[in-house]
Design a protein with these regions (language model features):
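C-terminal "post-core" interaction segments
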Residues: 1-342
Length: 342
C-alpha cells in the first residue's frame, strides 16, 4: 500500500493517444478522457469503459514546459476530474495532430485534428496551467507551441458529460498557501527562482555591445552574480562558500556552472505525429525517434550510468504538497463524519 503517488511527466513529449487514455483509466472508474475534432468539425470522444480502478488514493502530476501532447491530455483529464493535483509550470501547448504524406521528394505534413479536454478546453497553445506553480526552467516566450510561427489558436468546444471523481478544488488555495510558506525559506527554491528570473531578464535584452571593454565587464558581472547566488545557497545549506565557479564539481553541474546565455536551452520536445494519414483517433500524437542499431558487442561495452542521488527539489516539494493534500482530505472527511454524527 502507498499513501500517495506523484507522476512525474516533466520533459515528457508525449506518446500514443491510446496510452494516454489507458493511463487515465487507471485512476478513474469510467468516463470520457479526451475529445478529438477533425478538420470537418466532427468531434469524437474517447472513453475509458473499464470500471476497474488500479489506484484510488491521493495523486499528484508534475509537469513542466516540455510536457507535451499525450502528457497534456493525461494531466488535463486528471485536473478536470479533480482526480489529482497538477504541479509545476505551464506545459508546451501541443494540441494538434499531424499526418505525414509521402511525396516523390520528401514528405508533406498536414494538421488534421485538434485535441480538447473533457471540459471542452483545447490544450493547443495554452497547454495545461498547474494548480500550484513552480519556477520554470524554461522561458515560455522562447519554448512552446505559442512561440512557433502561425500556431493554431486556443479555443473551446462543448464539454462532455462527465462526473468529477473527487472534490479537491476547494483545497487548492490552502495547498498553495502551505506551499508558499514552506518554500519561502527553502534554499533550493529561492536559488531556482532567482536564477530563472535573472536568465529571463538577460534573455529579454536583445542587444549586444561591440565594445570589448563593455563585453568584458558584462562577463565579469555575470560571473559575479552566479558566484554570489551559488554561495548564498551553499551557506543556507550549511556548506562552505566557494571562491570561484571553477570549484564546482564538473560531474554535478549547477545552473551557475552552466551559466547559459539564454533563459532556457533551445530544446523542443518530440511532439511528433503519425507517420501515415490514419484517422485522428488512431494517430500517434508524440514523436517516434529514429532507432539506431546497436550490436550486442556495443551494448556490452556500455557501462551503466551511475544513479543520480542528488535530491530533486521539485520532486521533494511535490511530495510535501501531496502530504498536505492527504492531511486536508483527512480533515475534511473527519469534519463530514462529525457533522453526520451530530
Amino acid at each position: 500500500d502507498v499513501d500517495g503517488i506523484v507522476i512525474d511527466l516533466r520533459n515528457n513529449g508525449g506518446g500514443s493517444l491510446q496510452e494516454a487514455k489507458l493511463l487515465t483509466g487507471l485512476f478513474i472508474d469510467r468516463g470520457p478522457t479526451v475529445q478529438i475534432r477533425s478538420k470537418s468539425n466532427r468531434v469524437d470522444i474517447l472513453d475509458d469503459r473499464d470500471i476497474s480502478i488500479i489506484y484510488d488514493g491521493p495523486l499528484a502530476v508534475l509537469v513542466n514546459r516540455l510536457s507535451a501532447s499525450a502528457s497534456e491530455i493525461f494531466a488535463g483529464a486528471i485536473q478536470d476530474y479533480e482526480r489529482g493535483i497538477i504541479i509545476g509550470s505551464q506545459t508546451f501547448g501541443k494540441g494538434t495532430v499531424q499526418s505525414l504524406l509521402p511525396l516523390n521528394r520528401g514528405q508533406l505534413k498536414l494538421t488534421q485534428a485538434k485535441f480538447y479536454r473533457i471540459s471542452g478546453e483545447s490544450t493547443q497553445e495554452k497547454g495545461i496551467i498547474p494548480d500550484i506553480k513552480y519556477p520554470s526552467s524554461y522561458d515560455p516566450e522562447s519554448i512552446g507551441e505559442s512561440t512557433l510561427d502561425g500556431p493554431l489558436p486556443w479555443d473551446k468546444i462543448t464539454a462532455t458529460n462527465y462526473r468529477r471523481k473527487h472534490s479537491i478544488n476547494h483545497l487548492v488555495a490552502e495547498l498553495r498557501s502551505l506551499h508558499d510558506e514552506r518554500v519561502s525559506d527553502n534554499a533550493e527554491f529561492n536559488y531556482l527562482t532567482e536564477a530563472f528570473a535573472y536568465r529571463k531578464t538577460r534573455n529579454e535584452d536583445d542587444t549586444i555591445s561591440l565594445n570589448e571593454e563593455q563585453r568584458l565587464q558584462e562577463k565579469s558581472d555575470r560571473e559575479n552574480f552566479w558566484l554570489a547566488l551559488e554561495n548564498k545557497k551553499r551557506v543556507a545549506l550549511g556548506q562552505e562558500p566557494i571562491a570561484s565557479l571553477d570549484e564546482l564539481d564538473e560531474e554535478e553541474p549547477t545552473i551557475a556552472s552552466n551559466d547559459a546565455s539564454a533563459a532556457s536551452p533551445a530544446i523542443v520536445p518530440t511532439t511528433g505525429e503519425s507517420e501515415t494519414a490514419e484517422p485522428a483517433s488512431n494517430s500517434e500524437i508524440a514523436g517516434s525517434s529514429s532507432a539506431i542499431p546497436v550490436s550486442k558487442t556495443d551494448e556490452a561495452r556500455e557501462e551503466p550510468e551511475e544513479e543520480d542521488t542528488t535530491p530533486d527539489p521539485y520532486l521533494v516539494e511535490s511530495g510535501h504538497i501531496l502530504l498536505d493534500l492527504i492531511s486536508l482530505e483527512e480533515r475534511t472527511a473527519a469534519g463530514l463524519k462529525q457533522a453526520r454524527d451530530t
